[in-house]
Amino acid sequence: MNRMFRVLGFWTGIFAVMFYLGDMKDASLLFFGQTILFVFLSYLNLTERMYIYIFGAYLTIFFAGFTYYSIFIMVPGGGGH
């Protein structure tokens, strides 16, 4: 299970670099933070159950934050195209 957290760290790192190259600095910093978190957690050698609990908590926080952002902060049609 710790290898899967390294895989998550790898992919969030890839997304962070792509966001940075696309001049999306806030998203880039968010994904760099997630990369550091996932790689750090992968080297703790926890039990598989603990990794599942941590991932479940991560998903819960992400879904709540994304829902809050999309309802209260995001401006519909604000892309400027």
Swiss-Prot record:
Matches recorded under Pfam families: DUF2626 (PF11117)
Keyword Transmembrane attached: yes
Residues that span the membrane, as ranges: 27-47, 54-74
Keyword match Mitochondrion: no
Chief location bin: membrane
Domain of life: Bacteria
Localization per record: Cell membrane
Assigned keywords, A-Z: Cell membrane, Membrane, Transmembrane, Transmembrane helix
Membrane topology (UniProt): Multi-pass membrane protein
GO cellular component, one term: plasma membrane
UniProt name for this protein: Uncharacterized protein YqgY
Organism of origin: Bacillus subtilis (strain 168)
Lineage of the organism: Bacteria, Bacillati, Bacillota, Bacilli, Bacillales
Gene of this entry: yqgY
